[in-house]
Amino acid sequence: MSVEKPVAAGRQNSKATGRHKGWQAKLHMQLECAITGRGMKTVMAELHHYGPLRVQRPFYPEQDTAHIYLLHPPGGVVGGDGLDISITASSQAHGLLTTPGATKFYRSAGQTAHVSQTLTVQAGGTLEWFPQENIFFPGARVQMDTRIDLHGDAHFMGWEISCLGRPVNSEVFHEGKIDARFRISRDRKPLLIERLKVDQPSHLNAASGLRNFPMQAIFVATGSNEELLEQARECIEKQATDMPCGLTLIDDILVMRVLGTRCEKIQALMLPVWQLLRQATLNKPAVIPRIWNT
C-alpha cells in the first residue's frame, strides 16, 4: 500500500479580514483485488490524504470484501471548508464504505462549504457507498457534488441521506443554502442526475419540494430489472410505512426516494431493499457494517 504522509493543515483566520479560510482536505483511495495469505481479497493499493480526512484499516467481515470507514473532519464542517474525496474500485475489487456517524454542516457566517465526492468503478469492480446522514444546520451554506463514474459492467449500490435542520430539537432550516448534486454515468453516458437545492423556506413545504419533511434520501442500485423492481416494492409494502416513498427503474438502475422525519426509520425502510438487491445482483448476502451497531 502506498501512503502519502499528510501535510499539516488546519482552520485559519485571516488577520487582515478576519474571514475563516477553513479546512482544505483531500483523500484519494484506490481499491484492488490482490492475493494474500488468506486468498483473494480487496485491499487499499493506494491511499493519499491531506488534512483531516482519514480512513481506518479495512475490516473483512465477509472475507474478500473490504469494509472501510471514512472519517470526516472532527467537529463538523463550516463555511469555507473544502473536502475532496476520490475513490476508485479496480476490476474485481469490492469495497463497502461508510462513516461512523453523521456529517454535520454548521451555520455559516457567509462563506460556502464545498464537498466533492468522486466514486469511480472500473469494469468488473463493485463499490457500495453507505455514509451516515448529512445534517445541515439552520444557516449552513453548502455545495456538494457526488459523482459516480461506472465503466463497462461495474456495479454500484449506495445512498445519500440529507437532514435539513435538526428535527429532534424542533429546529427548522429557515435560512441557509444547500445545493447538492448526485450523478451517475456509465462509460461517460449520464444515467441519473439528481439535485437538491434549498435556498428559501418555500422549497421545504412545496409539493414539488420536501412537502414539509426535514429529511430526504435516495438509494440506488445497478444491475436491476423490472422483476427486482416489483420485489423491492413488495418489500416496502410489507413494512406498511407512512413515509412518502417511490421506486423507479432507469435503465438498469433501481432508484428509491424517501421523505421522512427520522434517519433510523428511513434507513430501516431502505435496508431490506439493499439486502434483496445485493443478494440478487451480487450473489452475496448483505453484511451490516459493525459500526452501525455502536
Curated annotation (Swiss-Prot):
Keyword GTP-binding listed: no
Presence of the UniProt keyword Chaperone in the record: yes
Record localization: Cytoplasm
InterPro entries, A to Z: UreD (IPR002669)
Region of interest called Disordered, as start-end residue ranges on this chain: 1-22
Signal peptide: none
Keywords associated with the record: Chaperone, Cytoplasm, Nickel insertion
Major localization listed first in the record, in broad terms: cytoplasm
GO CC annotation, single: cytoplasm
Subunit structure comment from the entry: UreD, UreF and UreG form a complex that acts as a GTP-hydrolysis-dependent molecular chaperone, activating the urease apoprotein by helping to assemble the nickel containing metallocenter of UreC. The UreE protein probably delivers the nickel.
The family this protein is said to belong to: Belongs to the UreD family.
Protein name per Swiss-Prot or TrEMBL: Urease accessory protein UreD
Species per Swiss-Prot/TrEMBL record: Alcanivorax borkumensis (strain ATCC 700651 / DSM 11573 / NCIMB 13689 / SK2)
